[in-house]
């Protein structure tokens, strides 16, 4: 039995020695021409290759002793070749430049590190060097395997939205897709557009409504409830800096409809003001409300249906498309057809000189209740763009770089009413109802509520109104 085990062990050792010799001899035996191309390393075998000129070991590096991993691509033969010390045995599977490079007296260069693609990664995706991606309002460039991003303050700040929504501030914020990708400065530049009030406008005497002081003012009032069909909803100025034109045209249209008791209910054209009133006819680059009211008095506007908004406000052919003449009695009549050929009525609507309403909360309420909506000049802060619902009050940015994040600019809106709510603690909260000009997808169907009686964001500082310029034939 013991002799049998010895025979088996001896046979096993003999087989192992034979296989090792066969393995070592593979680099010394040419298996034939059919293996000289298009072969990879077999298990335990390295086939011979055809010899070509080129730099292989010089690029890859040389390896001491036998190293089957010391291999590089032999492009001319579509194969692999070796640069290890085993090549001293005159094997033809070695790279052509092994002898000329690896046998030199100087030290061998280190082996090339395994190739890894250059570039950057973001969200599981690889980007090549020089690639540029957009992250909200900032551009990020892949440079030196790192992302280098601009540091603009974005109009949509997720951190600020979260801060507002987690706090008990009385209103909620939302991320609006139309604002995503814009910087805060771009929001101020394109979504507002009203210039700060001129000294002439601020020096106007305040006028109080003739409504008696004893008249009860309701806790809740909306102009459209008192004058249904005579007031007009919000439009969308898009990226045209013309809140000065939108608010002026809308207030004038409401006032003319109310004064004529529904005889003239057309919404007036802000595009008429944008294209014809502003200097150099570039009204999307901001304008003043006093200039807009001057134009309404001296030149007048056609309806929004007659002169609709241009799709491309930057087009070179957006010059003034309306002309009119005076009849000598203060009324003007259009001398050109409507830019919208479908609309036939090119009637010109005019207003009296504007007047300033008292900044007193009660006086503003009386004016709206007696004569209709008014124009308010307010200050827009960075958080206002994200308003969704509730009673707005400015919430200071939590960002440490306060000077960079806390900014404001002038905006013009239309006040249409007011109301009162009970707060979470049971306290009474008063608010104004205002129409913005950022479309109906923003805020509360295009409207917003804002604290009343405390001049929140200067909403009560400058209130403007006007009468429609109607003749005896126009009035009911």
Curated annotation (Swiss-Prot):
Domain SMB intervals: 59-107
Keywords: Basement membrane, Cell adhesion, Disulfide bond, Extracellular matrix, Glycoprotein, Secreted
A cellular component term, taken from the record's GO annotations: basement membrane
SMART domains linked: Pept_C1, SO
Transmembrane stretches, start-end: none
Keyword Membrane applies: no
Gene name as annotated: TINAG
Residues carrying the site annotation Cleavage: 49-50
Top-level division of the source organism's lineage: Eukaryota
Organism: Bos taurus
Alphabetized GO MF terms: cysteine-type peptidase activity
Disulfide bond residue pairs: 63-83, 87-94
Localization annotation: Secreted, Extracellular space, Extracellular matrix, Basement membrane
Protein name: Tubulointerstitial nephritis antigen
UniProt GO BP: cell adhesion; proteolysis
InterPro entries reported in the protein's UniProt record: Papain-like_cys_pep_sf, Pept_asp_AS, Peptidase_C1A, Peptidase_C1A_C, Somatomedin_B_dom
UniProt function note: Mediates adhesion of proximal tubule epithelial cells via integrins alpha3-beta1 and alphaV-beta3. This is a non catalytic peptidase C1 family protein.
PROSITE patterns with a match to the protein in the record: SMB_1, SMB_2, THIOL_PROTEASE_ASN
Assigned protein family: Belongs to the peptidase C1 family.
Residues carrying covalently attached carbohydrate according to the record: 38, 175, 314, 360, 455
């Amino acid at each position: 039995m013991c002799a049998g085990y010895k025979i088996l062990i001896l046979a096993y050792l003999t087989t192992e020695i034979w296989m090792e010799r066969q393995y070592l001899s593979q680099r010394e035996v040419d298996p034939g021409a059919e293996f000289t191309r298009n072969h990879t390393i077999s298990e335990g075998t390295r086939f011979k290759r055809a010899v070509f000129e080129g730099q292989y070991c010089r690029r890859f590096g040389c390896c001491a002793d036998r190293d089957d991993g010391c291999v590089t691509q032999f492009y001319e033969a579509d194969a692999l070749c070796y640069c290890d010390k085993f090549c001293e045995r005159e094997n033809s599977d070695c790279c052509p430049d092994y002898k000329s490079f690896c046998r030199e007296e100087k030290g061998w260069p280190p082996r090339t590190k395994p190739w890894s693609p250059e570039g950057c990664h973001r969200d599981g995706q690889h980007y090549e060097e020089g690639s540029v991606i957009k992250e909200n309002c900032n551009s990020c460039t892949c440079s030196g395997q790192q992302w280098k991003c601009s540091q603009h303050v974005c109009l949509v700040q997720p951190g600020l939205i979260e801060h507002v929504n987690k706090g008990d501030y009385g209103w909620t914020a939302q991320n609006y897709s139309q604002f995503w990708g814009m910087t805060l400065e771009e929001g101020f530049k394109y979504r507002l557009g009203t210039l700060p009030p001129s000294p002439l406008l601020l020096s106007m005497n305040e006028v109080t409504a003739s409504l008696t002081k004893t008249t009860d003012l309701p806790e809740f009032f909306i102009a459209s409830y008192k004058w249904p069909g005579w007031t007009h909803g919000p439009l969308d100025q898009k990226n045209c800096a013309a809140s000065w034109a939108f608010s002026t045209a809308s207030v004038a249209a409401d006032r003319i409809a109310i004064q004529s008791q529904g005889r003239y209910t057309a919404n007036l054209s802000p595009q008429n003001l944008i294209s014809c009133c502003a200097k150099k006819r570039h009204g999307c680059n901001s304008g003043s409300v006093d200039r807009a009211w001057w134009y309404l008095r001296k030149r007048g506007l056609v309806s929004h249906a007659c002169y609709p908004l241009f799709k491309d406000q930057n087009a070179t052919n957006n010059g003034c498309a309306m002309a009119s003449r005076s009849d000598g009695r203060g009324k003007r009549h259009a001398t050109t057809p409507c830019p919208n050929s479908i609309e036939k009525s090119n009637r010109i609507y005019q207003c009296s000189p504007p007047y300033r309403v008292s900044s007193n909360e009660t006086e503003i309420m009386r004016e709206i209740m007696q004569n209709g909506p008014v124009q308010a000049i307010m200050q827009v802060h960075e958080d206002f763009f994200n308003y969704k619902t509730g009673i707005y009050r400015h919430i200071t940015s939590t960002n440490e770089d306060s000077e960079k994040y806390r900014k404001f600019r002038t905006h013009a809106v239309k006040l249409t009413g007011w109301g009162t709510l009970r707060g979470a603690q049971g306290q009474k909260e008063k608010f104004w109802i205002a129409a913005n000009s950022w479309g109906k997808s923003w805020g509360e169907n295009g409207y917003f509520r804002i604290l009343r009686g405390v001049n929140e964001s200067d909403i009560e500082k400058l209130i403007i109104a006007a009468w429609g310029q109607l003749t005896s034939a126009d009035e009911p």
